[in-house]
Amino acid sequence: MALYEHVFLARQDLSAQQVDALVEQYKGVIESGGGKVGRIENWGVKSLAYRIKKNRKAYFTLMDLDAPAEAVKEMERQMGISEDILRFMTIRVEAHEEGPSAMLQRRDDRERGDRGDRGPRRDFDDRGPRRPREDDRPRRSREDEGDE
């Protein structure tokens, strides 16, 4: 049996339970064809680069498959018929990656905050602490410009 990575995009108006039901449905297709499903990663709702079937966002899901080609073809056939699936792509790989995918790692990186691993802003001793913005000198309004 060959190893595959399969990603599919489901419509944004589905609930999370409906997306999980789709995953279980296609997992059943693979298992009935004699294959196995490894990890399943739900990447959540993401914005699309362009509209697909009048949708600007979609649920992204990754599945690692160890299945014969016939089972994968049957799953792809059923996905092509389903109105809930916007796009899908299956890629044959030599080995499945260990640990979380690059998409999940990127999501974890964003949770660290704006400055990442650099920590909070520091005060530079030679300049002193930053002053609050409201202490700036008052700005001239447009009404003041005409008086001169």
Swiss-Prot record:
GO cellular component: cytosolic small ribosomal subunit
Top-rank lineage group of the source organism: Bacteria
Presence of the UniProt keyword rRNA-binding in the record: yes
GO MF terms held by the record: small ribosomal subunit rRNA binding; structural constituent of ribosome
Swiss-Prot/TrEMBL keywords: Ribonucleoprotein, Ribosomal protein, RNA-binding, rRNA-binding
Cystine bridges: none
GO aspect biological process, one term: translation
Listed InterPro entries: Ribosomal_bS6, Ribosomal_bS6_sf, Ribosomal_S6_plastid/chlpt, Transl_elong_EF1B/ribsomal_bS6
Region (Disordered): 97-148
Coiled coil: none
CDD domains on file: bS6
Protein task: Binds together with bS18 to 16S ribosomal RNA.
PANTHER family membership: MITOCHONDRIAL 28S RIBOSOMAL PROTEIN S6, SMALL RIBOSOMAL SUBUNIT PROTEIN BS6M
Family the UniProt entry places it in: Belongs to the bacterial ribosomal protein bS6 family.
Official protein name in the record: Small ribosomal subunit protein bS6
Encoding gene (name): rpsF
